[in-house]
Each structure stands twice: as structure tokens, then as C-alpha cells.
């Protein structure tokens, strides 16, 4: 029998609406979603109320011409409207395309055209830009506010030319359930890798069910626990690591508009938060000696096992590694597992792991650094595909193994140690940035002969992009060229992708076959002010 068909059979009859319905029947009055906007107490939804609003939205979307398989852009900062619309698309059988709100118009044009999105849901802050970037959309629906903040007069005027989000709600009594199809796509997130354009990662309902099963086990999340979600909801951390983990056990999600150091602990205390994802910029708040003692926080979902931080923060940091393509945690480790300090834990059951020498294609021995490869069923443990990108799909997989681009080594007791990421992929404050995408923009300037973009260490964001440039002429006005490069990048790239500096050099350090040694460029960048 076909192993992939057997894997899919295990998900028979299960999808996102099945999951929502289960908890609405089992725990109708238990809080599912709590909105925690800035300086205010927001509304909350029980599981019964959440299912009702999701059905109402699904009915309304269908009435607006959205059919199963259609793709709907959701371009918004964290807000309950975004979560409800995301779940409603899944319930209807449509595909929610959640996009980064730092994206500029050119990027939104690409997202809309590449996914062939038919409609969009957004906020007043973005509707003007989105309408210009994607004029082919059938309609755009706009929320009344920007994640709890009132719109400006210009934003209000722009919003009035489009549908109101609240007008999308229909009559839940008219909802007609569809047959469950676990392998049906439900969501698309864009991720930057080593290619020049972000790739559209397709997740299925089976991916969601997998995340809802595995996520809670990996982080000891129980039905009476509460997970604080502050990472952007257009990222896999918020969607799969957090929200689907909550839905897997009927727990509670508390949603913040975005990271706020001043609101972090008050929200945790007020809502008895037990679990939180730990991003680099949250470390200072967790280690604040004046943090309140009367809190229930006990688990931080982090990348590595670091007992010293456990003691400093007064919570347990669970090691979890994954990416958009792995849906949830592909490795995991708990302080009680007895694994070495600094490891990412062990491979999560359901995935297979290999550490491969990139030059020879052979397995590395324990202690040797190689590329991390993962194997699982596509559409269950791993993403289904990169949408409409056969070249990227072919390049990403080899004999069923997904090549992550991350360099690791195996240690004692199956522990995995992170070494470095692919030289052409940067991680800026949690956002993936393709060096090649930035290089493509910088390299179009007439004064640039060659360009190499690398990461420079940053205290707050971990790393930021910088560009090393070889000029096409010897007497170039470096200040003027730098200014023009920055302007071009700001026009065409999201703010986190824009180089923080341009360094002019006479030559790049190179190795065999004249390959640019980006590691040396990173060291050169860190040595500069």
C-alpha cells in the first residue's frame, strides 16, 4: 500500500471546521479567543460564539462570490477580525492568503498576482495602498479600526470606497457544511528563502490538524492553559505554533495587536497566561527584575535549551525548531529531557531527520556540521507545495526529503545543535529576508558593478541586512549612490529588508571558483560601526 495514502487516511473526516465544532460542542462556554488591544479590555469569544461568528462570516463570504478554492488576501495587523476571517475561509473551503503588513505596494502586487487572489480583507491603514497595488480584486472589505486604534481622516475616506468588514457577516442558520477534505488547502503564507522572490507556502487542513495534535504535546499545553499571541498572525508561529496548539486542546488564546513591552506583563497577569512564544525582543521583558511575581506564566516556547535563562526568567524555556514549511515544531526539547544545553531538542515523532554534507550529499557523522533535511508526508507534517512554483518545489525536495537550508550537527542522545543558516537567508527580528531579493534591487543601480548582502549583528533584531558594493566606476559619489540605493529599496522592499548600511569595497573575499565568502563579509560588517 502507498504510505502517503495511509498517512492521509489517518486524517479522514478531520479538518478545521471539524475541530471548531468539536470544541463548540464539548466546551461551548470555555473562552477560545480573548482580544487584548492597547490600553483596553477587548471582547472575548467562547468556543460556541467563535464557531457562530466563523459560520456567519463563511455565509457572508459565499454571498460575496467566494467559492471553495478561491484565494482571499488577509492583510492586517493582529485583530480578532483577522482570526475570524482566516477560520471562515477555511470553513468555506477557500484559501486565506495572509500577508506581511510591512510589505510595500510592489510586494503586494506580486502577492495578489502570484496567488490569483480574488478579494481582500484589510484595515484602514492599508486599504489605500492595497487598492492601488491590486486593482483586479473583485472587492475589498475594511475593518472599522486599526487593531483597536481609530483610523486617520485619510484612512477613513479611503475605507469608505470599499465594503465594511462587518457587512460580510451573514446568517449562521444558513450555513451549509461541506464534506471534510483534509488535503484541501486552507492557507498560504509567503516566506523568503534563498531565491529572489518570496515563495507561497501552501498549508492544508491536514497540516492544521497535525499542528493541533503535535503542538500541545511538545509544549505541555493543556485545556485550561492560556497562550499569549503577540507575533504577527501572518507568521507560522502565531498560526500553527500558537493558535492551532490552542485549538488542539480547547485552550484559550489571548491576542495582542503586536509586541508591546509595557503591555506584556499586564496582559499576562490579567488573563492568567501560561504559555508564550519567546522572540529575541521579548527577552528584556522576561528578564525584567521588576516583573510581577503574581503571574501564571510557566512555559516560554524558544529555540534552544538554556537552563541559565530558565533560572533568570523563572519559567521553563522549551526548545522548538521549525519553519513555515514544517508547519509546527520539527524538533522539540524540554528542560526535563536531560538534553545538552544549547540544543534544539530531538526530532519530533512523525518527522525523520538527516544531516547531509552539502558537497557530497552523504550523511554526516555525529558532531559534523551539515544541512538539516526533514522527511514527512507533504500536506501533513510538511507543507503541501510552493504555489505555482514547480522550480522551487523541485529544488526544495530530494527523494522526499525537504532541504531546510539550516546547518546543524547531531550531538549526544539525538540532540540537534543549530550551527548557522544558509548564507543567503537572513533573520531580521523574526522575519526571513532573502539576500538575493535585496541584491536584485541594489544591483539595478547603474553605479553598482557587484553587490553582496549579508547580516550584521544587532542587539535588538539579532541581525540586520547590510550591502557590500563594488562600484562600476572608480570616482563614484558614494554618498549620493548610497542615498539612491536606499530610496530604491524603500520603494520596492518592506522596511525590514532595507539595508541599514552600504559599504563600498574594491573586491569581495572569494574562495574556490571565485565564490564570495559571505562569512568574511559578515565579520567585516560586525567590525564596522
Features from the language model and the residues they span:
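Conserved pre-ATP/AMP-binding loop-to-beta segment of ANL
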Residues: 28-31, 141-142, 159-163, 169-190, ...
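Conserved AMP-binding/adenylate-forming core of the ANL superfamily
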Residues: 29-79, 83-87, 104-109, 205-206
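Conserved AMP-binding A3 loop
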Residues: 44-48, 186-210
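A short helix-loop-beta submotif of the ANL/AMP-binding
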Residues: 58, 71, 77-97, 101-105, ...
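Structural core segment of the AMP-binding/adenylate-forming
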Residues: 59, 63-64, 91-164, 272, ...
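Conserved AMP-binding/adenylation subdomain of ANL enzymes
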Residues: 93, 209-226, 234-275, 348
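AMP-binding/adenylate-forming catalytic core of the ANL superfamily
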Residues: 101-110, 120-122, 276, 353, ...
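Gly/Ser/Thr-rich phosphate-binding loop
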Residues: 270-341, 352, 363
Amino acid at each position: 500500500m502507498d504510505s502517503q495514502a495511509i498517512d492521509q487516511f489517518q486524517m479522514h473526516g478531520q479538518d478545521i471546521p471539524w475541530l471548531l465544532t468539536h470544541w463548540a460542542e464539548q466546551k461551548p462556554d470555555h473562552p477560545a479567543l480573548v482580544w487584548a488591544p492597547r490600553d483596553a479590555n477587548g471582547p472575548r469569544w467562547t468556543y460556541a460564539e467563535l464557531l457562530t461568528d466563523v459560520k456567519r462570516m463563511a455565509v457572508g463570504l459565499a454571498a460575496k462570490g467566494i467559492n471553495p478554492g478561491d484565494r482571499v488576501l488577509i492583510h492586517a495587523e493582529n485583530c480578532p477580525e483577522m482570526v475570524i476571517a482566516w477560520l471562515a475561509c477555511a470553513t468555506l473551503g477557500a484559501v486565506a492568503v495572509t500577508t506581511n503588513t510591512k510589505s510595500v505596494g510592489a510586494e503586494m502586487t506580486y502577492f495578489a498576482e502570484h496567488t490569483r487572489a480574488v478579494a481582500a480583507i484589510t484595515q484602514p491603514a492599508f486599504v489605500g495602498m492595497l487598492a492601488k497595488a491590486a486593482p483586479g480584486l473583485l472587492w475589498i472589505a475594511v475593518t472599522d479600526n486599526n487593531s483597536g486604534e481609530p483610523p486617520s481622516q485619510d484612512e477613513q475616506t479611503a475605507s469608505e470606497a470599499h465594503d465594511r468588514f462587518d457587512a460580510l457577516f451573514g446568517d449562521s442558520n444558513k450555513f451549509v457544511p461541506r464534506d471534510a477534505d483534509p488535503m484541501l488547502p486552507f492557507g498560504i503564507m509567503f516566506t523568503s528563502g534563498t531565491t529572489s522572490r518570496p515563495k507561497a507556502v501552501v498549508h492544508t487542513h491536514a497540516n492544521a490538524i497535525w499542528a493541533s495534535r503535535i503542538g500541545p504535546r511538545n509544549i505541555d499545553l493543556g485545556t485550561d492553559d492560556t497562550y499569549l499571541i503577540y507575533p504577527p498572525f501572518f507568521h507560522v508561529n502565531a498560526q500553527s505554533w500558537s493558535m492551532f496548539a490552542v485549538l488542539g486542546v480547547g485552550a484559550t488564546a489571548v491576542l495582542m495587536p503586536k509586541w508591546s513591552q509595557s503591555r506584556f506583563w499586564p496582559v499576562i497577569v490579567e488573563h492568567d497566561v501560561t504559555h508564550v512564544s519567546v522572540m529575541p525582543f521579548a527577552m528584556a521583558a522576561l528578564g525584567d527584575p521588576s516583573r510581577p511575581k503574581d503571574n501564571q506564566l510557566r512555559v516560554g516556547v524558544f529555540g534552544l535549551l538554556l537552563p541559565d535563562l530558565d533560572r533568570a526568567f523563572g519559567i521553563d524555556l522549551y526548545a522548538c525548531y521549525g519553519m513555515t514549511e514544517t508547519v509546527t515544531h520539527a524538533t522539540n526539547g524540554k528542560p526535563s529531557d536531560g538534553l545538552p544545553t544549547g540544543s534544539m531538542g530531538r526530532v519530533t515523532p512523525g518527522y525523520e531527520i538527516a544531516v547531509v554534507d552539502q558537497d557530497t550529499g552523504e550523511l554526516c557523522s555525529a558532531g559534523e556540521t551539515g544541512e538539516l533535511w526533514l522527511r514527512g508526508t507533504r500536506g501533513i507534517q510538511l507543507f503541501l507545495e510552493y504555489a505555482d512554483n514547480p522550480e522551487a518545489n523541485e529544488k526544495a525536495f530530494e527523494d522526499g526529503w525537504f532541504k531546510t537550508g539550516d546547518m546543524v550537527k547531531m550531538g549526544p542522545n539525538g540532540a540537534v545543535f543549530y550551527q548557522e543558516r544558509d548564507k543567503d537567508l537572513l533573520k531580521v527580528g523574526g522575519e526571513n529576508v532573502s539576500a538575493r531579493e535585496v541584491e536584485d534591487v541594489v544591483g539595478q543601480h547603474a553605479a553598482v558593478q557587484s553587490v553582496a548582502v549579508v547580516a550584521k549583528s544587532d542587539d535588538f533584531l539579532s541581525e540586520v541586512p547590510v550591502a557590500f558594493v563594488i562600484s562600476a566606476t572608480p570616482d563614484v559619489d558614494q554618498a549620493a549612490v548610497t542615498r539612491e540605493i536606499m530610496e530604491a529599496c524603500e520603494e520596492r522592499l518592506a522596511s525590514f529588508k532595507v539595508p541599514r548600511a552600504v559599504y563600498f569595497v574594491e573586491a569581495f573575499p572569494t574562495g574556490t571558483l571565485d565564490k564570495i565568502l559571505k562569512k568574511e563579509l559578515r565579520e567585516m560588517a560586525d567590525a564596522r560601526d
